[in-house]
Amino acid sequence: MSKPDVAQVKAFLLQLQDEICRSLEQADGVGRFVEDAWAREGGGGGRTRVMRHGDMIEQGGVNFSHVYGDAMPASATAHRPELAGRKFEAMGVSLVIHPHNPYVPTSHANVRFFIAEKEGEEPIWWFGGGFDLTPFYPFAEDVQHWHRVSRDLCQPFGEDIYPEFKSWCDRYFFLKHRNETRGVGGLFFDDLNRWPFADCFAFMQAVGRGYLDAYLPIIERRKAQPYGEREREFQLYRRGRYVEFNLVYDRGTLFGLQTGGRTESILMSMPPLARWEYDWQPEAGSPEALLYTDYLAPREWL
């Protein structure tokens, strides 16, 4: 395995955060990200950037963090005893965008790197990440575009990579208590160290950059589409599922909250408004019903 270059990964992640914020500000036209730089007591820190009340983006956050320490928390080494007694570094960019317009899907992306080192031993390292789309009023052409970008960026790394990481995404973003996917998926990967460091890093970069290629054209197509109170109410109802997933299943959220992470940055992914309604059912044959029948179960899009 080629030796990991931690500084190179960090430089890319900082640049990626800048690039994503710049592109989303452009797409919004009015809103600006406000930065909150923070430090972690045990070592490290980050840059949390949040946009609120933009023209297209109701609320969105793009977070960079880089934390390190002399030993992993017990909760992290319980199922990975080989990490015990090693100093560690973890860094990543994660983002969630909640648009105003119900015809523009919510999107999420994350790329991260982890390394644990011990004097006289080989470092243990891996990459993780992915991106996924959560439409409220889906258009097949948008979902196909999202998955086409996903497939194309995976192609140079092997024919089997897109099907593997697409399927992992479908399994991961699944609400068991609702028996539905969170959205229409995309890519998800973790523990990636199957190739030399340079190749794994190149894949993580492709995913990070691919997010904008996948999302920006959908924003442009849908952001001016007229909507009314009915669509807004449904958007808020479906956002409730986003909250349920993040608080019940999301590994990053749970790990962060359980290990004394920065709560404001961890909960940045929450929508600004959401609603619940007892035993709500969509009207048969309605656009809302179409989401349930055609989009909230894993399927092949290409």
Swiss-Prot record:
**At what residues does the UniProt record annotate the site feature described as Important for dimerization?**
177
User: What is the disulfide pattern of this chain?
Assistant: none
Q: Which reaction does it catalyse?
A: coproporphyrinogen III + O2 + 2 H(+) = protoporphyrinogen IX + 2 CO2 + 2 H2O
Q: Where in the cell is it found?
A: Cytoplasm
Could you say which residues bind substrate here? 94, 110-112, 260-262
Where, in this chain's numbering, is a divalent metal cation bound?
98, 108, 147, 177
- The enzyme class is oxidoreductase
> Would I find Phosphoprotein among this entry's keywords?
no
Concerning PANTHER family, the annotation shows: COPROPORPHYRINOGEN III OXIDASE, MITOCHONDRIAL (PTHR10755), OXYGEN-DEPENDENT COPROPORPHYRINOGEN-III OXIDASE, MITOCHONDRIAL (PTHR10755:SF0)
What the record says about family reads: Belongs to the aerobic coproporphyrinogen-III oxidase family.
Spell out the subunit comment: Homodimer.
This chain belongs to the protein called Oxygen-dependent coproporphyrinogen-III oxidase
Q: Taxonomic lineage per UniProt?
A: Bacteria, Pseudomonadati, Pseudomonadota, Gammaproteobacteria, Aeromonadales
The primary gene name is hemF
